[in-house]
Design a protein with these regions (language model features):
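Conserved small/polar residues in nucleotide/adenosyl-binding loops
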Residues: 186-193
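ATP-dependent carboxylate-amine ligase catalytic core
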Residues: 10, 34, 39-41, 46-49, ...
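Conserved Switch II/interswitch segment of TRAFAC-class P-loop GTPases
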Residues: 180-182
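Hydrophobic anchor at the beta1->P-loop junction of P-loop NTPases
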Residues: 56
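Conserved beta-strand/loop subsegment of P-loop NTPase cores
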Residues: 174-175
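A conserved segment at the C-terminal end of the G1
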Residues: 64-79
């Protein structure tokens, strides 16, 4: 289901409102698991199922690995979506096609659509998706809208329960170096860290 607030005559949030919304969502807390991202993407028409992925995990080196792989794919003629973190200057760096960041207009349109679904989810008894889950769903939505041939994305910090693990069309999975940083976040013992990725 393709829905655009611009097609209905409604006014989408502006960039500042979008950033305030994401900041507010960060105060809602986290419920471990994939239930929220799965439900949000279902309501968006499961955009991730129409995409192919190179999925990169690890403690260090994910960004460099993503840059190498996406540049190679782009040079080979693919329309490459990139989902990265952290950002250096601008929030829109998180979601790129080739070397072009998502525009403020597309970001706001996507977040407006997602916000409506999140509000409906809460009304239906679901936990509100986290900022990372919203960003991940936004990336999937945007890359499908822009018809990317392949998406290169980094995991977050959630191990098996990371929102990016919703994808089922991974073409290549890449492990960069793995350290102990995830232990404090996921509350795993040292020997469990690698098996949880």
């Amino acid at each position: 289901m393709k829905f655009s607030v611009y097609d209905t005559g409604e006014t989408a949030m502006n960039y500042q409102e979008a950033m305030k919304y994401m900041e507010k969502v960060g105060t809602y807390g986290i419920v471990p698991g994939l239930d929220s991202i799965r439900e949000l993407c279902r309501r968006l028409g499961d955009p991730q199922n129409d995409l192919k992925f190179v999925h990169i995990a690890g403690t260090n080196g994910k960004g460099s690995t993503l840059a190498y792989i996406s540049n190679i794919l782009q040079a080979a003629g693919y329309r490459v979506g990139k989902y990265i973190s952290p950002v250096i200057i601008d929030y829109c760096e998180k979601i790129q096609i080739g070397k072009q960041k998502i525009t403020h207009k597309d970001l706001c349109e996507g977040l407006e659509i997602i916000k409506k679904h999140c509000d409906a989810m809460v009304s239906d008894g679901f936990h509100h998706p986290t900022p990372f889950e919203i960003e991940t769903a936004l990336a999937f939505w945007y890359f499908r809208e822009k018809q990317c041939n392949i998406v290169v994305l980094e995991t977050g910090m959630g191990g098996r329960e990371d929102a990016t693990n919703l994808i089922t069309t991974t073409q290549v999975a890449v492990l960069a170096s793995i350290g102990m940083d995830p232990v404090s976040y996921t509350h795993l013992r040292a020997h469990e860290t690698r098996s949880n990725l």
